[in-house]
Amino acid sequence: MVMSKISFVIPCYRSARTIEGVVAEIQDTMASIPEYAYDMFLVNDCSPDDTFEVIRTLCAKYDNITGISLARNFGQHAALMAGLRRSDGDIVVCLDDDGQTPANEVGKLLAGIENGSDVVYASYESKHHSAFRNFGTWMNDIMTRMMLGKPRELHLTSYFAARRFVVDSMLRYENCYPYIIGLVLRATRNISNVPVTHRSRMVGTSGYTMKKLLGLWFNGFTAFSILPLRITTVTGITFAAAGFIYGIYTVVKKFVNPHVPLGFSALMAAVVFIGGMLMIMLGLIGEYIGRIYISINNSPQYVVKEEVGNNGKECGNGSVVNEGKKG
């Protein structure tokens, strides 16, 4: 029997005090599942603390860990893509660097894969996030249902396992706006959930700010669906029809009673409202056009500054590589 290989991909940001514990838990857990070989890919998303120095130490200590450092902060999803592109496991497991996603329950995700699912997401009965982060998750869930057709009963989190063919399909996306959930849903709908316990954060606070969450929502809103453009078209047709009908009504009313005032205030309110709607629609269309331009302009999905592995050997120290586009 050929031993399956598991690749763990962990995006790291401000995790100098937590990543060692996560790695140790993975090692302890995998020691109890001897039927799998495994390796780890730790991606430093240009963290301002000593995260990459800790990763470098771990790479020197263990020969199945590879450390990747990005040239600037590209975001969690781009960091995941960097790790996925380096991984070569039959099954890839993605999890967080803060210890909130329980590595000791990875067996549940692997069992789901072995039972036939292409992707298995961890689901939490209760989350130990701030109210702000939980609101962001709720909004993201609504958006993925509307834009990407996600089933209502499916829970999507940052802790999941995927088969190799799903990862390979995700990696065919080379533009600079990666959205992991959209890439997964585009590859397969054979997705299941397994219940796991969501832990409290070991130290620190979430790296997601309002700006980052808004960017993530807008990315998912526009990257994998033209539904917003269709909504814009329907809205425009609706307002045009309403304006035409109101115009006929005004003319008829004037003929019936010539002394009725036309209503300057109502007219201005309608003009301002419709003008605002037009600006929103133009902005949305402009966002799509801007993304097309940036993608054509070969903006990188991420840039690798340094990579360490193979028991501490440096593989690309100081190199700047555009991994998002390959000629």
Where are these regions (language model features)?
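Hydrophobic helical membrane-anchoring modules
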Residues: V2-M3, Y179-G327
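Acceptor/aglycone-binding surface of glycosyltransferases and processive sugar-polymer synthases
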Residues: I68-R72, Q76-R86, Q100-P178, R199-F218
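Residue-level recognition of specific faces of alpha-helices
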Residues: D39, V54, N64-G67, Q76, ...
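Solvent-exposed polar/charged
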Residues: A60, R85, A111, N115, ...
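Histidine kinase transmitter module recognition
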Residues: P11, T29-S32, V43, D98, ...
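Structured catalytic core of nucleotide-sugar glycosyltransferases
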Residues: M1-S130, M143
